């Protein structure tokens, strides 16, 4: 009976991880499918909300794990990147299609999904930088300089 419960629990965790990962389209697929996304305000707002959420979740998870071994630099990097994307989210909200509460709600939804995925990854093999997390992190890292510059220029334009 206990063995069956363990098997059922393991299956539920695996299924939960799969469902959460499938709820989010990989950012690389999104960028490939929509190469002009940076010119679309709605798509840019989605990406900055999602990257901000990813960085927040990763920095919190690493703090929870008391990650060391150059971890302090990594946590500081993730926190700073989160702040940059948050500034981008706020600036694009002022200039854009969705107001700040809408993009904040979107960001919280992404954070919840990323949190579930990192927790499932941790329970599975004691690593959080797996699959979708690692793939999305690469996209967020690649686009961070572009969104930082865009947020800076938009802030000047809208008189922030």
Model-predicted segments: where are they?
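Short stretches within intrinsically disordered, low-complexity N-terminal or propeptide regions
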Residues: 12-14
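Short N-proximal segments of mature Sec-exported proteins
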Residues: 37-97
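Cleaved targeting-peptide boundary
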Residues: 21-29
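Sec-dependent signal peptide recognition
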Residues: 3-10
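Compact alpha-helical subdomains of small soluble proteins
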Residues: 78-160
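N-terminal signal peptide c-region/cleavage motif recognized by signal peptidases
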Residues: 16-18
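Short, charged/polar, low-complexity loop and linker segments
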Residues: 29-36
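Stable alpha-helical elements in mature extracytoplasmic
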Residues: 23, 44-51, 133-136, 143
